């Protein structure tokens, strides 16, 4: 279970564009109190709750995509 953070890289992109490993699946998306019927064309929004099922190391790799993108630092 992961909450899509504002500024996350996945926001606005269709689920079908995610290059998830074959062992990882999005099984549900909640928007507010509503369970949404989703498809590959569905785009995630901030505060969506995404239920993912997969291997632990694959999930660990993908979780940062649902979190806020790190601000780039100037040198």
Residue ranges and their predicted role:
Residues 1-68, 73-75:
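Cytosolic Rossmann-like ligand/nucleotide-binding regulatory domains
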């Amino acid at each position: 279970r992961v909450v899509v953070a504002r500024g996350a890289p996945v926001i606005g992109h269709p689920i079908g564009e995610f290059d998830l490993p074959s062992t990882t699946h999005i099984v549900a998306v909640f928007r507010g109190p509503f369970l949404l019927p989703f498809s590959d064309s569905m785009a995630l929004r901030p505060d969506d709750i995404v239920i993912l099922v997969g291997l632990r190391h694959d999930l660990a790799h993908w979780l940062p995509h649902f979190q806020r993108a790190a601000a780039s630092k100037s040198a």
